[in-house]
Structures are given as structure tokens and as C-alpha cells.
Amino acid sequence: MTLNSLPAWTALQSHFEQIRHARLRDWFAPQNDPAPTRAERFTFSGGGLAADFSKNRITDETLRLLVQLAREARVEARRDAMFAGEIVNPTEGRAALHTALRATDPHAPFHAQVSAERAKMATFARAVRNGTWTGHTGKRIRHVINIGIGGSDLGPKMVTHALRHVATRDISMHFVSNVDGADLARVLEQVDPEETLAIVVSKTFTTLETMTNARSLRDWFVAKGCPEDALAKHFVGVSANPAEVVKFGIAADNVFEMWDWVGGRYSLWSAVGLSIMIAIGPEQFDELLAGANDMDRHFREAPLERNLPVLLGLIGIWYRNFFGSQSYLVAPYSEALHYLPSYLQQLEMESNGKSARLDGRFVDYPTAAVTWGEPGTNGQHAFFQMLHQGPTIVPIDFIAVLTPEHPLASHHPKLLANCFAQSEALMLGRTLEEARKVAGPGKEDLAPHLTFPGNRPTTTLLVDALTPRSLGALIALYEHKVLVQATVWDINPFDQWGVELGKILGKVVEADLAADALDTAKHDSSTTALIARARAALKR
């Protein structure tokens, strides 16, 4: 049965027509919001987090029908299959067991293997942190460069930045991902080769960007006086292909394993997170895993009606497939979560930006929305104008951390006030009549410019304090949200074939840039002209 033919889908279409013009400010009016209030009915907790869904354009009936949709789409069955280690990535014939990386149950899939690798990580991380592991001249490691791209970069960078307040001050963490040499050159200007450790992270250890940067970094070490037989003191590798790591020149003892049953964008819990563990220490890394495991248990055990990942995913479907929203915004009111929107861009769009269903037929409904965002309050002074007064409705996830992780506590009430006020303003709006009063006598022409449509939907996620545990829960919340949506849309969130074609053609273009003569028949006229211009520039 296709999605459009599910009874709940049909019922949701009728329900949408009934409430599409209803206004949130009316629903929140005191006479329409008796106890239990909307805030009480639509605020739920799990995994140490709280989520206020009340400012969404939903009613009790909306949630009832959305949960019915989840059941008809067999969300619970696919969830259970994923946790059990069944093949839930059929195009690659793989399980998706990122949850096993943080499981405490000794009967969980691959528990012994995961525990052994984490113990190896912890031993190494402690040695780097306490100075037992040194560079080839005996100096302590003061700089760690993580070389990876996509899931091998975004997750570790996001978490390391978010948890700087619990990280060691003795080691600086650097992240290099782009094949643009400026990325690596910028970092090399800041580090001493005698005090630098490189972590090269690639599932296959053949990724173009990562291996280009790794080779350049290896050459830099040698040029700076590191003997080739001493490079083992400065390089470790993380990969599912240990043989390729050794072929690159990294000592076998310096190889940390990841597995093909963990997707890159779900892998920060594995040895891919070695840079995180060095930064915050093994004990705090365990807390990160524990927080994710808290959310895993909530996802598995909470009824769908009160299940945070399920509700977050279903409400996203409500806006994407019924309201027709093209994008959604993530606005963490926390500078520590600066890189969370970038991380979620990959998690959501690489996972669910698909058009082929599991049975190979193409969807006839929208899937992943464009994910974007910026920390508050910066975003207010950049794009919130469009959110408030533009014609496009963009659903928003606000994320508020209730207690600061820094000593400037007097700033925090201002930060929280802005977060909560934005959600209220987006919901309420300002009518033309109200705008005329604001404009004042004789300025009626200004009133239209002072109106706000309102009725803009938002969810507010509350985190008591930004700790490794709460961050782990927050990340896992979005991981499971992705699975919920993928299940309803009947797509595979664990592959990423969309990145392949460009990589294949990229190798052809790279060869053409270096060829003695350009074959003008090989490409379309636009690409040929671009290559010709680049060839001329590269020869200058």
C-alpha cells in the first residue's frame, strides 16, 4: 500500500482542509485555552529533554491522526528492526547499528567488539592527554588535526565545539575537511609539527578530499624534519578498511576500526569520535554515549503519542507534505551549538533527500525539506525578517539551554528572553489594526509595513544544561526523527547514492584539466568552456 492510500493519510488531508486557516493566536486566547492548556497538552519530555509543540498548527486530532499514520506506516516495526541489527539499508545490504555503539546491554549486537575498540580509544586518548604519547622529538602533543569530510568531520567538529567548556585546555583541536588547500594551510600556520597529531578518518580510506589532505600533511611533516620512520608518532587512522590505512603508511597499531554497519553521518559515537574523546576525555565521552542511549530507550519504550523523535518527525511531515513547506530552520540559542545546523543538514538531507522508494518506484510526494539555521541571536539580525514578514512559512525548531556553561551569567536571561519572545512573536503576529496604533497618528501609510502575519509554527526544545549527556540525547533525538520520517516516506535513510555521480565525473574533469589537449567532444559546451578557462588559468 502506498503512502497516499493509507487511511490516516486520507484523513489527514481532510483534517488539513478543516484547520489550514485556523490561527494559533485564537487557539491560545484565554477563552479558548482552558486547563489543561495547549502548553500542558503539547509539551512532552524524554531522554532528559523537553519539547514544547504547542506553537505548532496542530490540534489533539492532528496528533491523533499523525500517530495513526506512524502506526500504519509501521514505524515501530522498522525501529525495532534497526535496533535488532536487521538489514534496514537494503541498497547496500547492511544493518544500521549506530545505536549499538552506545548500548549498555551486553547482549546488544557487536557489544564485545564495540567495547574493545572503545577501550583502545580510551587508552590512546589518555596517553595523548597526559603526555605519555609524544611526538617524535619527545614533546607533548598540543595540537590534534582531524582530517575527514562529511560524517568524519561534521559530527566530531560539532561536538568538540559544543563541549569546549569541559575539554582540556592543553590541546587545541583543528578540523580540516575541504580539498581546497586553504583549509589545511590555515591550520598548518597555527601548529608546531613536533607537537601535532593527525587523525585521518575515512571509512574507505580512499575519499578524495581526505586522502589529498592527508598526503599533503604527511609531506609537511617530512619537510619540517620528521623522519618518515617516525611518522607513526604523528599519525593515526580511523577506517573500516585497515589494509588501506597501512598502505598509506600509518602503523597497524595506530589504526582504529569503524564498521560498515555504521553510516558516516551516524558515526561520531565510534572511533570517528576519537578527536572528541581526546578533547573531553574518556569519562565524558561515555556520558555523551549515555545521553544518546537515554534517548534510544525513550524512542523504544515511550508510547508514540508521547515519543519525542516520533512527534518531531511527524510534525515535520505535517508541514512538508500538507502545508507544502520547502525548508525548516534550526535555531539553537546557544553559541556552543554553532555547528549543530551544519551537522543536521547532512543528517537530514543526506539521509532523506531521496526520490526512490524502498521498492524502487519513485515517490509522488515531497521528502526531506531543506535544513538550515544559525545560532540565536545572530539569526535575528540576518534572516528573521523573512521569517516574520515574508510570504513563505518556515517551521522552526528553537533550542534553548536553560543554564549557561560559561561565567558570564548575566547574558543568559537576555538570550533566553530573545528565544522565547521570537516564538511568541512568530505565533501572535501583529494585525493591521494593531500596527496602526503602533504607527501613530498621521502615519497610517506605515502600518502595512508594521504588520506581522503571525501563525508561524515553532517547536521549542529545552535543555537544562549543555553537558555531554544532554548533547548526546539531543543528537540521538534528531537521528531517530530521521528514521521516523524515512519510514513514513518509504525511503532508505542510510545510503547516499546521490554523492556518487559528481565524484565520478570529477575524476574525468580533473584528468582533463591536466591533459596535454582538451577533448572538446567529451563534455557539454558549458563544462568544456569552464575547463578551458581553468586550464588557461592553471598554466599562468
From Swiss-Prot:
Its top-level enzyme class, in one word, is isomerase
- What UniProt keywords apply to this chain's record, in alphabetical order? Cytoplasm, Gluconeogenesis, Glycolysis, Isomerase
- State any GO CC term: cytosol
Molecular function (GO) terms listed?
Answer: carbohydrate derivative binding; glucose-6-phosphate isomerase activity; monosaccharide binding
List the Gene3D superfamilies. Answer: 1.10.1390.10, Glucose-6-phosphate isomerase like protein, domain 1 (3.40.50.10490)
Q: Which SUPFAM superfamilies match?
A: SIS domain
Query: Which residue stretches, if any, does this entry annotate as coiled coil?
Result: none
Which EC number(s) are documented for this chain?
A: 5.3.1.9
Name its GO BP terms in alphabetical order: gluconeogenesis; glucose 6-phosphate metabolic process; glycolytic process
One Pfam family matching this protein: PGI
Pathway note: Carbohydrate biosynthesis; gluconeogenesis; Carbohydrate degradation; glycolysis; D-glyceraldehyde 3-phosphate and glycerone phosphate from D-glucose: step 2/4
- Cytoplasm is among the record's keywords: yes
Please write the reaction equations for the catalytic activity of this protein: alpha-D-glucose 6-phosphate = beta-D-fructose 6-phosphate
Residues annotated as the enzyme's active site:
350 (proton donor), 381, 503
Locations listed in the record: Cytoplasm
The free-text function statement in the UniProt record for this protein reads:
Catalyzes the reversible isomerization of glucose-6-phosphate to fructose-6-phosphate.
Report the sequence similarity comment from the record.
Answer: Belongs to the GPI family.
Task: Read off the HAMAP family from this record.
Answer: G6P_isomerase
Name it.
Glucose-6-phosphate isomerase
Native source species: Burkholderia multivorans (strain ATCC 17616 / 249)
The gene name reads: pgi
